[in-house]
Each structure stands twice: as structure tokens, then as C-alpha cells.
Amino acid sequence: MNRVAFLGPHGTFTEQAVWDFELDDAHLVPVDSPSQALAAVRSGEVEWAVVAIENSVDGAVTSTTDALIEAPGVQIYGETELEISFAIMTRPGETLASATSFATHPVGYQQVRRWMATQVPAAQFRAASSNAAAAELVASGEVDVAAAPRRAADLFGLEIHA
């Protein structure tokens, strides 16, 4: 069985990338950062790590670049490209009009900030450790809106508005 570290929780774009590698026997290990994912490889806790390297809007993912520099001996074995599409979600029954806060990963923020500024102007941004973690923040009532993968809405029982 291949153990694979990825930026968690379940429902992230990084988890989606894991499935693109078709590791049928993969045991997924969610971690909180690219640095933790690569450290898990170095320690032998997992055989593989899947981390985001770049995106089309904001360029290089600096937290991953930094983590690779700090992880001598770790080798890149493959890559995949994902079509990224954010869903805007709330707790069931809530509206975007009443939202005062929203969360997403800082890299994701660069991709949705203009839309959020025009569609939900009262919502103040809060950084989350991942886009799916932003959905968890909505589910727990800590923020009103998340920009996250559609799968995160399913996993955390949220309603998609856009």
C-alpha cells in the first residue's frame, strides 16, 4: 500500500491531484502544509507526497518552493495539471447577502478576490490553511462563506451558491 501525504483536510484540490496519479492502493494522509508533506516523506511516514507547485493566477506556490528547499533528497517523480474551479458555499439556508466573512487559502484568494469583492462586498477575508479547511470553517460557524472545491461542500454539508 502506498501512503501519500497531501494538503488536507479531505476535499482539497491537492487530494484531487492524488487521484490523477491513479494510485489504486493509496492510503491518504492529510497534513497541514507542503512542508509537513515533504517531511513525512523524509521520515518514512509516507512513500509519496503530492504538493502544489504553481497556479495560473499567482505563479509559484512559495510555501511548496520553500518546503522543497528544506527537504534535501526529496525528488519530484511526476506532475499533473488540474482544472481549478471554485465553488462559493455557505451553511444550508444562509445567503451570500448576509455574509460578513469568507475564507479560502491565500493562493485561492488571488483567484476569487475580484468576484468576492463585487458579489459579496461586505465579506472580509480570512486565510485558511487550505481551501477545504475554509469549508470546515464555514461548517463550524467560524466564517460565513468559503471558496473551495465542490467536493468540500459535499463533505461538510454546505450549500453551493456559485
Ranges and model annotations:
Residues 1-162:
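Domain-level signature for soluble enzymes in the chorismate/prephenate branch of the shikimate pathway
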